[in-house]
Each structure stands twice: as C-alpha cells, then as structure tokens.
C-alpha cells in the first residue's frame, strides 16, 4: 500500500469514528460563543475590536488554524511573505481573511468556521501521517510546523477520497486569498496593474477616447431617478404599521398590488412592463444592496462580499452539508442582479433549444414569440458588436489559435455596452456607467412610472390562501404576498416583514426562487395532487471549466476590452440527415475571460508555495479561457444547497471541449497550459493532451467547475404534473404566482443566458399586463 493510500484509509477510518464527531462538535460549539471577549485576547484581536467590539469572528483556536493554513500554503520564508513583512509590516493576513469572511455575512462565516474546525481537528486522527513524517501523534493542525502543514495539505490534494480533495480546495482559498488581497506589496510582485480608479490620469485619458458622453449622462440621470424610488429602512420603520402575528412575533407590513422578488434580468423587465401598461402599485424586492456606479470600487476583496452570492456544491460530513469548491456557482446580489455584474455578452437564445422546449416539454412558446422582445431589448440596451480595435490580447490569441487549427470562430461578440473604455472590471460592476443594465436602464424605466424598490430585504416564503372547491384551472391556492426580513449590508436579519399583494412574481434566481417555493409548501401541494414535486429539479450550470495558457508576450488579462471578443463553438446535429441549421445544437463554446488576483490564485496549480508564486508573477503573460458546456439538467437545488454531478452521457463531450481548448492555447503560442484542478494538471506540449486529459480524469471529476450560469429549478412546460410553471410563467398550483428568471429554463442553453432571460421577463411581463388590463 502506498503512503497516499495509507493516508486515505487512515482518514476514512478517522471520519467514521464517533470521537472525531465529538471533537468536531466541541470545536464548533466554541465558535458559537459570539458574545465572548475571547478574540480580544488573541494576537489578531485588533481587527475584531475595531469591527465588532467583544464579538469574535474566529475563536483563538480558529485564528491559529487560519494562520497555519496561510503558513502552509505561503510559508513565512517565501519571497512574498518576506516582502509583506518588510514593506507592509502592519498587514496581518489572518485579520485580512477574518474581515473578508465577516463581510460575506453570517451564513458564509458559519460555513468557514466549520471548515476551519474540520481542517484543524482531522490531523488528530491521522496516525499514519504522523508516523511517516516523525510528527507527534494526535497533533492538531494549529500546532504543525509550516512545512509539515504544507505536506499535509498536499496529502489532502492527492487523496483518492473526493471529499478530502474538496476540503483541500477550501483550504487553498483560505491559504491564498489573504496574500493576494494585498495591494501595496503582492500586486507589485505579480505586476498586476490594479484598478484604474488608482490611476486617474490613465482613466481620464481613456475616457477622452469616447466619441460622446450623451449615453453616460443618460445613465447617470437614470440611476438618480432610481435612487429616489429606493425605500429607506428607517423610513419604513417609522411609517409602517407593525402587526402582531401568531406566537407573539411582530413584523412590519407593506401593502401593494404586485410584488416582484428579484431585480435582475427577468424581474426588472417584468416590473418595467407592468409599470408601463398597468396602474398597479409595484414593489420590487431585492436581497442585495442598492449600489451606484461610484460604489463599484474595482477591488475583489471589497466587492466580492457586497455583490456576489456564491453557492458551493456540498460534501456530507456526519449528516451536515459543508461547502466545497468542487462546483462553485456565482450569482449577483445587488439591485440589478447578476446582469449588472456580468460581462454584458448578448447571445440570442438558440433556435433548436426553444424548439426542443416545445417538442419535448410541451411548452407553448417558440422563437417567434420571443423575437419581437429580443429586437426591442437589443435597441433599448444598444446591443452591438465590439469594435475590432478594442479586442484584447487574450482574445486575439484565441482567434489566432482557432485560425491555426482551422476551427470556425465567431466574433467580435455583441454586448449591451456603449462606448466601453476597457477598464477590465465588468464583473465587479461598471464604475463608468457604460454597461447598459437593469440598474441604469430597465429599473429606472419602472421607477419613473411609480414602481418602488426595497433593497436589503430577503424573502423566505410566499403567503398562500386555500381556494374554495377545486380552485381556478386546477390551482388550489392563491398567492397573497410574501414574508421575509430586512437585513443590514452583511445580510444579517433585522425586522421581519410581510408584503401583502394580489400577485407575486418570483425572479430571485435558480437558487432562491425554488427555495422560496419549497419554504412555502408548493412541493407538498403538488404531491397532494399526485404531481411530481419538480421544484428544484432539472438544474444545470453550463459545467464551465476555466483554464489558462502561459505565453511569452504580455496579454494583460485584467484589462480586456471587452472581456470577450472572439469565441469558438462546437455544434452537434440532432438529426444527421438534416441540413437545417435550426437542428444544430451548441455543444460547447470557448470564450476568453477577465481575471484578477484573488480568482487567479485559485486557478493556478499548487505544487509548492514557490511554484504557485512563480505562476502568479506571470499573471500578465497568462490567457484565461472558459469552456462552457451544454450540460444535461441533472442537478437539483435543495433547501440549503445544491447537488450537481456532470451526467455520464456528457463525459465524452466535456473531454472533447477540454482537449479543444488546450489545442487552441498551444496553437496560439502558449508554452504551457494548466487547468483548475485539485492536483496540478499542467501540459507543456500538445502531445500530452490526449494522454493527460483522459476520460478517467473526467469520471473522477478532478477538474473543478466554476459557473455563473445557473439554470432550471422551476422549469416551464406544458405538463402540470411534471413542470412547475406554464409557458407564461404562471404557477400550475398557485393562482397569482409567477416565475420570471433563469430558473424557468427546462434545459441548458449552451450560450450565455442573460439575453434570453431579458426576453422571457419582457414576454411574461407583457402577458401579465394584458391579463390585468389598464
């Protein structure tokens, strides 16, 4: 038995022992002492005093564990750590990570505490590891020497047990993120140019290249108009009735006609259509903050907690779901939703996909139903091809590689942006108001016609009222509003709130919309009628893989104009005898990507601290490519997490996509190609592609999936027993309840879904407005 196999067997036995559970529970209980002054007595206590007074972010043991994780991945004797100590002596990586985790909110912090405790306690039960390397038995990680901690993490990385490999990924994030957050030293070491916000001369020069400022003036005025219709929490508390409900709990009560839950691509267009065509009172509820362009600070450490909602696939440990980085899905949590922080790519829905919805799902919708909405949205958001002069170095390399291989390539891509100046921070919000989004175009349209926005309000359930008899069209209940709670900027719960309305539109996204329905009892309503529970099912992600090519010439991946300029598509024909292009499905697409230090540190393979830092120093010579795969909708959203495994039928196609991407990189001139995998997956020549990128690698799912395109969970269709809503977004089970976001999509699209969701939102909004009348 190899040392790695012995280690895996030892850990497998350890995790099955009751003593491990007891030890872990004891550590987790200590973390719950939130009112204890423990943090103030630790070496890293000054941050906790500044932020929280006597409330701890991490316990002393957790702080020591975080410090050891950081030391394990970036030991104090490495170049970056030495320079940090010399040039920025007051920078404490543990404090930096504590502040970062705290800013993400209580749920994220609880998950991180559990992960930290797990990583700390696990070595106590790994006698094989201790014996082989001459370590005292029963050591916790916090007591390891940095070199031994590093060796321990490499054992986790190479484990044959998938949960342990996923734990390594979580530890890698903790161990690298606080190092690459540092602006004064680390950015200088890796030659990262940093935000244009820090270089006013460069910013002003590029702004001057724009042909006019008319559009920027218009979008600025739009955001001001929207701001006036955003409800302040203090005003609500002062002016609203407080109702006492069963159990003695108080809640604020708002009355309106239509409540739209979610302000992104779908919800914004529903609200705009209803505001224009009806006289109904409309309230748009958003769990995230209202941020204006000046709030987009172009720094990952500051913006990620405020604008990103990150969902991790989970690993079961003693009945508890703990987050991993095996599959990560990122969505937006701010007024304007994901559409405000995406890359503004505008791909029309593929005709074959819409046709399949009709033929295979019984959906009463076809491409012609969406075409007028696509056309209107294209004009409203000024969707146009990116000028050739603005294509970034990375995307030119993508085109060069595709041409060398004779692969058909498409581009420049079309985007909903006007006079983009190429700052490279599309994914952190457009500070210059050049990206045309729900925030600065669509929601202001609704606001100017009377709609209001309630930000920092998390909805948890729909209020349902039973209908007499058989109800209307088989619908047994009526929606009468929603319940939830106001939050602070971190998402911490404040007052309970009840919003009473005659109609409810869920547009909260493929995670929140299904969970709201689950909490409302809709799956049980369906089961009582003999229908499939369906809610949360048919979830897909585009199974996106991000990988990198290391080039000799600078490509500047953080300053792309636009983030994606060219792309390569692979098609499959569902009818081999047909020449009709409408029978050609997009199987996968390869697109150039933006990148910044925190995210890049997770993509870079980890062999040792020195090798990882060497890769990071070549940041500007790196091209990042995403393989977006049209996966089968086999995932499932649950009440607290999501379950996702790539379908076995997709393995061969996914492998073809990975190999094609690697070949393009080498054909473009890359000297090596590396993938976002648990173990280092590095190719130094094209001859290694077929052998290294194997079907077995895909089956073991050792390559990590990171997606921004969740779809499904409230699938539309024509079968009330199988589908959650009909083709107009109407719930099959609840009268007055609608869904209008990407959770509607019964199958994966194969292209970026935002434009499709815009069109579905406008289509559903127009249909609902026609039902209501003026």
Model-derived regions, located:
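N-terminal secretory signal peptides
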Residues: 1-16
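Conserved redox-cofactor binding core of oxidoreductases
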Residues: 178, 188-235, 364-461, 465-466, ...
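FAD cofactor-binding and catalytic pocket of flavoenzymes
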Residues: 56, 316-318, 342, 532-659, ...
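N-terminal FAD cofactor-binding segment of flavoenzymes
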Residues: 287-336
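Rossmann-like flavin
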Residues: 147-148, 155-167, 332-335, 339-420, ...
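Flexible, low-complexity segments enriched for small/polar residues
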Residues: 48-190
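Glycine-rich loop(s) and the adjacent beta-strand/alpha-helix scaffold that form part
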Residues: 269, 273-283, 288-300, 334, ...
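A glycine-rich dinucleotide-binding beta-alpha-beta segment and adjacent secondary-structure elements
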Residues: 422-426, 463, 671-747
């Amino acid at each position: 038995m190899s040392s790695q196999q012995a280690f895996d067997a030892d850990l497998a036995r350890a995790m099955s022992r009751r003593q491990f559970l007891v030890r872990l529970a004891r550590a987790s209980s200590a973390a719950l002492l939130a009112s204890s002054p423990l943090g103030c007595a630790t070496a890293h206590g000054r941050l906790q005093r500044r932020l929280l007074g006597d409330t701890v972010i991490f316990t002393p043991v957790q702080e020591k564990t975080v410090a050891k994780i950081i030391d394990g991945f970036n030991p104090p004797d490495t170049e970056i750590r030495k320079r940090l100590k010399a040039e920025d002596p007051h920078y404490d990586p543990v404090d930096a990570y504590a502040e970062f985790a705290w800013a993400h909110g209580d749920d994220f912090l609880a998950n991180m505490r559990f992960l930290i405790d797990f990583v700390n306690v696990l070595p106590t039960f790994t006698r094989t590891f201790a014996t082989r390397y001459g370590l005292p038995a029963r050591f916790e990680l916090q007591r390891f020497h940095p070199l031994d901690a590093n060796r321990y993490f490499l054992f986790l990385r190479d484990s044959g047990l998938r949960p342990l490999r996923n734990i390594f990924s979580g530890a890698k994030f903790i161990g690298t993120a606080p190092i690459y957050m540092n602006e004064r030293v680390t950015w200088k070491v890796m030659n990262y140019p940093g935000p244009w916000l820090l270089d006013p001369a460069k910013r002003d020069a590029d702004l001057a290249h724009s042909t006019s400022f008319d559009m920027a003036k218009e979008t600025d005025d739009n955001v001001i108009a929207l701001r006036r219709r955003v409800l302040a929490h203090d005003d609500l508390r002062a002016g609203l009735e407080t109702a006492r409900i069963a159990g003695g709990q108080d809640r604020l009560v708002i009355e309106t006609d239509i409540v739209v839950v979610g302000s992104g691509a779908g919800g914004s267009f529903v609200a705009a259509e209803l505001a224009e065509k009806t006289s109904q009172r409309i309230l748009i509820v958003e769990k995230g903050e209202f941020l204006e362009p000046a709030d987009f600070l172009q720094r990952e450490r500051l913006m990620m907690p405020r604008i990103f909602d990150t969902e991790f696939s989970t690993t079961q440990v003693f009945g508890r779901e703990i987050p991993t980085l095996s599959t990560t899905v990122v969505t937006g949590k701010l007024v304007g939703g994901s559409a405000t922080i995406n890359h503004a790519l505008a791909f029309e829905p593929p005709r074959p996909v819409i046709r399949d919805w009709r033929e295979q799902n019984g959906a009463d919708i076809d491409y012609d139903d969406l075409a007028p909405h696509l056309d209107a949205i294209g004009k409203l958001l000024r969707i146009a091809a990116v000028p050739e002069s603005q294509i970034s170095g990375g995307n030119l390399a993508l085109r060069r590689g595709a041409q060398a291989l004779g692969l058909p390539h498409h581009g420049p891509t079309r985007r909903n942006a006007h006079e983009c100046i190429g700052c490279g921070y599309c994914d952190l919000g457009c500070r210059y108001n050049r990206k045309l989004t729900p925030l600065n175009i669509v929601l202001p349209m609704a606001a100017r016609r009377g709609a209001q926005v309630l930000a920092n309000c998390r909805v948890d359930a729909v209020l349902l009222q039973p209908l007499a008899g058989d109800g209307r069209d088989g619908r047994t209940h009526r929606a009468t509003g929603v319940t939830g709670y106001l939050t602070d900027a971190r998402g911490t719960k404040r007052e309970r709130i009840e919003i009473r309305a005659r109609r409810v539109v869920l547009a909260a996204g493929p995670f929140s919309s299904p969970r709201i329905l689950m909490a409302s009892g809709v799956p049980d309503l369906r089961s009582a009628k003999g229908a499939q529970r369906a809610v949360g099912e048919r979830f897909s992600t585009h199974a996106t893989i991000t990988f990198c090519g290391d080039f000799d010439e600078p490509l500047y991946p953080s300053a792309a104009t636009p983030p994606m300029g060219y792309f390569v598509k692979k098609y499959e024909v569902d009818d081999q005898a047909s020449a009709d292009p409408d029978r050609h499905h997009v199987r996968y697409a390869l697109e150039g990507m933006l990148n910044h230090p925190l995210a890049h540190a997770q993509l870079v393979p980890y062999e040792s601290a020195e090798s990882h830092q060497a890769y990071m120093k070549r940041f500007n010579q790196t091209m990042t490519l995403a393989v977006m795969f049209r996966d089968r909708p086999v995932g499932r959203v649950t009440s607290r997490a999501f379950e996702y495994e790539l379908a076995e039928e997709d393995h061969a196609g996914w492998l073809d996509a990975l190999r094609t991407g690697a070949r393009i990189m080498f054909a473009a001139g890359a000297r090596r190609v590396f993938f976002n995998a648990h173990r280092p997956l590095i190719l130094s020549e094209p001859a290694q592609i077929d052998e290294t990128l194997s079907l077995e690698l895909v089956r073991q799912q050792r390559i990590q999936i990171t997606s921004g395109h969740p779809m499904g969970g409230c699938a539309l269709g024509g079968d009330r027993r199988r589908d959650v809503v009909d083709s107009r977004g109407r719930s099959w089970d609840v009268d007055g309840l609608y869904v209008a976001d990407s959770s509607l999509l019964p199958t994966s699209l194969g292209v970026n879904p935002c434009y499709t969701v815009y069109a579905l939102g406008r289509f559903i909004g127009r249909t609902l407005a026609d039902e209501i009348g003026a």
